[in-house]
């Protein structure tokens, strides 16, 4: 089984890891609701599930009088 011949120093290890950075998620604004949401994700707004400006699920309850 392969194993390292020498110990890699903390400095050398950390230099290698400088390129691994956290990036901020891409945020879109829905044209219909004006709600900010992640790209390619459906989002809830006032009891309705929206995706690309269309209502997918309508969970608003109508009160019968």
Swiss-Prot record:
Region (Disordered): 1-24
Pfam families for this protein: Ribosomal_L32p (PF01783)
A GO cellular component annotation in the UniProt record: large ribosomal subunit
Entry's Gene Ontology molecular function annotations: structural constituent of ribosome
Gene Ontology biological process terms from the UniProt entry: translation
SUPFAM superfamilies referenced in this protein's UniProt entry, alphabetically: Zn-binding ribosomal proteins
Biased composition regions of type Basic residues, renumbered to the chain: 1-20
Keywords of the record: Ribonucleoprotein, Ribosomal protein
Listed PANTHER family: 50S RIBOSOMAL PROTEIN L32 (PTHR35534), LARGE RIBOSOMAL SUBUNIT PROTEIN BL32 (PTHR35534:SF1)
Family per record: Belongs to the bacterial ribosomal protein bL32 family.
NCBIfam families named in the record: rpmF_bact
Protein name: Large ribosomal subunit protein bL32
């Amino acid at each position: 089984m392969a194993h390292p011949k020498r110990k890699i120093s903390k400095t050398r290890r950390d230099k290698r890891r400088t390129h691994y950075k956290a990036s901020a998620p891409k945020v879109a604004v829905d044209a219909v609701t004006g709600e900010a949401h992640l790209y390619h994700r459906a989002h809830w707004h006032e009891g309705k599930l929206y995706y690309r400006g269309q209502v997918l699920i309508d969970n608003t309850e109508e009160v019968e009088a």
